[in-house]
């Protein structure tokens, strides 16, 4: 597992950055909807 991570150090950060951005947006959206539901209830 550690070898795999050190094998593609150039492709890891790019994918991680994109995934992080998408995940962050999705997380914010889900959290917002959850909070809205709680507040509306």
Swiss-Prot record:
The listed locations are:
Cellular thylakoid membrane
The reply on keyword Metal-binding is: no
Q: Which InterPro entries match?
A: PSII_PsbL, PSII_PsbL_sf
GO biological process terms, semicolon-separated: photosynthesis
Q: What is its main location?
A: membrane
Any idea what this protein is called?
A: Photosystem II reaction center protein L
Q: Which family does it belong to?
A: Belongs to the PsbL family.
Pfam families according to UniProt: PsbL
How is this protein positioned relative to the membrane?
Single-pass membrane protein
Q: What is a single cellular component term in the Gene Ontology annotation?
A: photosystem II reaction center
Alphabetized, the UniProt keywords read:
Membrane, Photosynthesis, Photosystem II, Reaction center, Thylakoid, Transmembrane, Transmembrane helix
């Amino acid at each position: 597992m550690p070898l795999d991570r050190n094998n593609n150090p150039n492709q890891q950060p790019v994918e991680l950055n994109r995934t992080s951005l998408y995940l962050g947006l999705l997380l914010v959206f889900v959290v917002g909807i959850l909070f809205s539901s709680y507040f509306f209830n």
